[in-house]
Each structure stands twice: as C-alpha cells, then as structure tokens.
C-alpha cells in the first residue's frame, strides 16, 4: 500500500492536441482544482515497476473536502484507511490492529492528496506545470521544483472538468495509476467522514 501512503486511462481517439504556456497551465489547473470543494468517488489503483510489470492492484473509495480533509479507504485486496482531519493524518491497518498518527504535511510535493483537498493557490511554487488537451480530456504534468519529494512527476487528468485519473512516477521509475469512477463534486459530506476513532485496544504509533 505504498502508493496510498504517498497520496495520498482509456485510450482516446486521435484529435487535436494543444500545449499551453506555463502561466496559463497554472491558472487552468488551479481553476479546475478549486472548482470542486468536495469530491467523492470510487477508485482503482495499479502499481507497475519500471519495466511495466504489475506489482499491486487495489480499489476502494475516497472523499475529499477543502481545506485539507481527506478519506481514502482501500477495501481490496488488503483493507487500509487513511483519514485527514486537516491537522493530523491517521493510517489504520485493521489486519495489524494498528493506527499510525502524524501531523499533516501541507506541502503539496509531500502529500499529493492535498491537490484535491488543500490550498492550491501557490501550486506554482512547488511544481513546474505543463498541460495537454485532447478532446474532452485535459492532462497536467507536475514536476517538483525540489528534490525532497516522494515522486519525480505527477500527472493529473480531468474529463469534462472533473478529476479522472492520476499517475505518480517515483525515482526508480515505478508508476502508480489511480483511476476514479462515479466522481461527484460539491455534494455535502458528513464531518464524521474525516474523523477516525481508533478502536479500543489497538496499537497506536505517534510520529
């Protein structure tokens, strides 16, 4: 579940592809991200090594809400829950009956999930951004400006203005693809979704 800790595509018919200047890319990406104050979806995740060999598959559900709230529940093949209440992140492993709790790192380069739930107004300070459009899909490629990051590049794709998929590539070429399905934006999400009560008797690790 390495990629879940980090976080925190259909082939398209050939069409016109356009590239844009960086400032326009930043403005467009910021607009698309900020347009969705809440998002809920199912996701499927595939992790590949540098040669393209499948390392891991997973699926589950997610919910995010600005500012800084997210819920990521992997239900198969190995259950895991990651919850942020905007101040701290709790990682729950039911198999180990163990909760790991740490302060939320608000740097986008360290917590990619905050692209969907955090403050992206200064996103250009963290990344060099480029974009490509093809039909109803817009792809943004983000490359961190510093070396102290969990990934070398991050691609974020939108279809008809809604998040469609993400791909993270790390320093050894390992790729994690996350495809979102049944995406709903700007619907009410209960506050309880972003609170995690550690089960009685569980091990708790504070980092």
UniProtKB/Swiss-Prot annotation:
GO terms for cellular component: outer membrane-bounded periplasmic space. This is Outer-membrane lipoprotein carrier protein. The keyword Glycoprotein does not apply. Residues 1-21 form the signal peptide. Monomer. Its main location: periplasm. One of its GO terms (biological process) is lipoprotein transport. It is found in: Periplasm. Keywords: Chaperone, Periplasm, Protein transport, Signal, Transport. The keyword Signal applies. Belongs to the LolA family. Disulfide bonds: none annotated. It comes from the Bacteria.
């Amino acid at each position: 579940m390495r990629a879940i800790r980090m976080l925190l595509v259909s082939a398209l018919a050939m069409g016109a592809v356009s590239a844009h200047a960086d400032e326009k890319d930043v403005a467009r990406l910021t607009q698309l991200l900020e347009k969705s104050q809440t998002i809920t979806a199912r996701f499927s995740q595939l992790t590949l090594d540098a040669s393209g060999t499948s390392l891991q598959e997973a699926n589950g559900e997610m919910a995010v809400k600005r500012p800084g709230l997210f819920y990521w529940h992997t239900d198969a093949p190995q259950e895991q829950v990651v919850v942020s209440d905007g101040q701290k992140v709790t990682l729950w492993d039911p198999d180990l009956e163990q909760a790991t709790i740490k302060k939320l790192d608000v740097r986008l380069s360290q917590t990619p999930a905050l692209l969907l739930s955090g403050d992206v107004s200064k996103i250009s300070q963290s990344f060099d951004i480029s974009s490509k459009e093809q039909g109803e899909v817009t792809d943004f490629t983000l490359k961190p400006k510093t070396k102290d990051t969990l990934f070398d590049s991050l691609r974020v794709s939108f279809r008809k203005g809604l998040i469609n998929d993400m791909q993270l590539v790390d320093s050894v070429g390992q790729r994690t693809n996350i495809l979102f399905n049944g995406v709903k934006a700007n619907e009410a999400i209960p506050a309880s979704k972003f609170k995690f009560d550690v089960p009685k008797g569980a091990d708790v690790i504070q980092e």
